[in-house]
């Protein structure tokens, strides 16, 4: 049974691959290429080229055959390498998009350090007068409150990593609303954009371990989509993908 099946497969294979030499293999590939093309999606001109490529021996005149072969070599090259050229164009386009985005971000508002707000008026002015595209993250703290020092240190690092985000801090006693920000709710994080409060987290240190660092705060804010993608990370990721391809 197995021998009969094997013999049948061999006969089928031999019936399909009728050419044995190097030129025969090429012609078999050309024929397969033609047969595998979807007749509804292939332009008539391309089908004619592939059909002619599949049987170059049909021409009788030697000079015509040579000219035809040269022509087909060019057409064949174009067909084979068209997809690769499209991939290269796509990579260039993606790289250009990332560079454009990086340039736009570079020319936008940039901060790079933590702003200490001294009064409630300064706090309100920062929120109301900052550009609408800017995300403002405010830490309301008080000296001696657990987690406040660690959060201030984390802000210092994140302000460098995300220069397009404005990181601020203000003591609860300076807000003019001390009764709203008692020690029970500190440290508190408030996030604004376009003059509107978009997120607030009271006693935010409870979200972290006993000891926490900038990376923990970054991950927490990213969970809520409050931080943009880092510029250097976006460009490095694109370059890495291109190197792999």
From Swiss-Prot:
One BP term from GO: regulation of G protein-coupled receptor signaling pathway
Residues bearing the modification Phosphoserine: 73
GO cellular component labels: cytosol; nucleus; photoreceptor inner segment; photoreceptor outer segment
Pfam families: Phosducin
Entry annotated with the keyword Nucleus: yes
Stretch list, region Thioredoxin fold: 111-245
Similarity comment: family membership: Belongs to the phosducin family.
Protein role: Inhibits the transcriptional activation activity of the cone-rod homeobox CRX. May participate in the regulation of visual phototransduction or in the integration of photoreceptor metabolism.
Name under which the protein is recorded: Phosducin
Organism: Felis catus
């Amino acid at each position: 049974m197995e021998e009969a099946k094997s013999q049948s497969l061999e006969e089928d294979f031999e019936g399909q691959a009728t050419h044995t030499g190097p030129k025969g293999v090429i012609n078999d590939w050309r024929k397969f290429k033609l047969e595998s093309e979807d007749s509804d999606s292939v332009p008539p001109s391309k089908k004619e080229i592939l059909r002619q490529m599949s049987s170059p021996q049909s021409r009788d005149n030697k000079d015509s055959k040579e000219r035809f072969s040269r022509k087909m070599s060019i057409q064949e090259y174009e067909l084979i390498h068209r997809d690769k050229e499209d991939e290269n164009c796509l990579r260039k386009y993606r790289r250009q998009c990332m560079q454009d985005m990086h340039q736009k971000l570079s020319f936008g508002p940039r901060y790079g350090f933590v702003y200490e707000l001294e009064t409630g008026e300064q706090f309100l002015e920062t929120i109301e007068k900052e550009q609408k595209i800017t995300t403002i993250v405010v830490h309301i703290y008080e000296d001696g409150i657990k987690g406040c020092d660690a959060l201030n240190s984390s802000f210092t690092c994140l302000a460098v990593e995300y220069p397009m985000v404005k990181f601020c801090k203000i003591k609860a006693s300076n807000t003019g609303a001390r009764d709203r920000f008692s020690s029970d709710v500190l440290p508190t994080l408030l996030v604004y954009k376009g003059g509107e409060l978009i997120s607030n987290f009271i006693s935010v240190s409870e979200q972290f371990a006993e000891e926490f660092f900038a990376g923990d705060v970054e991950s927490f804010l990213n969970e809520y989509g409050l931080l943009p993608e880092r510029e250097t990370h976006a460009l490095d990721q694109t370059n890495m993908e291109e190197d792999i391809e």
